Amino acid sequence: MCSSDLFAESLGMGTSMVVLMPQAAAGIGMEGSDGASGAAGADGTGRDGAGADGRGRGVPVLYLLHGLSDDCTIWERRTSIERYATEKGIAVVMPEVRRSFYADEAVGEKYWTFIAEELPELIARTFRISTAREDTFVAGLSMGGFGAFKLALNHPERFAAAASLSGVLDATSLDLSWTGTLGERVWAGNEIAGTEDDLLGLLAQADPAALPSLFLDCGTEDELLDHNRRFITAAEERGVELASRLRPGAHTWDFWDESIQDVLDWLPLQDR
């Protein structure tokens, strides 16, 4: 694990991220352990410097996004994501975006520019991670589910797959009164429909053949269930292939801990 504070040019300030690199060999307590720690270095290399997969090839990467009330450490604190990812041989990048809705805030910081442009370039320079589309994935929960599908729909050429867990998938219908000044800070009262934040609008105009694989998971007791139902309907109307699952569960970490394991199983990871 690498937990890092960094200066982001697009934000004009310092920010944080957590990066998990897969172990070069099975570690103690992992299935198939040979007794070696197998910990990867900060640049993703093993002890022989050959790269996390042992052959000098960059490893696949999952950008894993946090929700509105969380930060870049939440996935590690609430799930066993490091163990899950190590078993799959995939790197995980968890950036900090505060309560930005993965947007260039109207009154605030350019978090969309950071997440969509600066962060991937920074990761490619710093870690031994593949930049190939077929090795690049994104997922998130709640606000992070919105961010994951926003990246996938605005930049389908970059991602092989995207997953939303209990996602905020219809920002045009949000009642922002409960979030205080969030709506004014992020959107300044401007219309969301027809913008890069209008996921249903983007879906309606998308070329289904050009999109990454999409996965949606939401609990039937989740307050965002209607958002997810609307996205499923919009995908069906556009002929977009969507792996969707509405199952018993609420907006909880018990649900997401199970869900992220299913996402990792679903990802089209290449034989390495």
Protein language model regions, located:
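Non-catalytic cap/lid and distal C-terminal segments of serine-dependent acyl enzymes
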Residues: 1-272
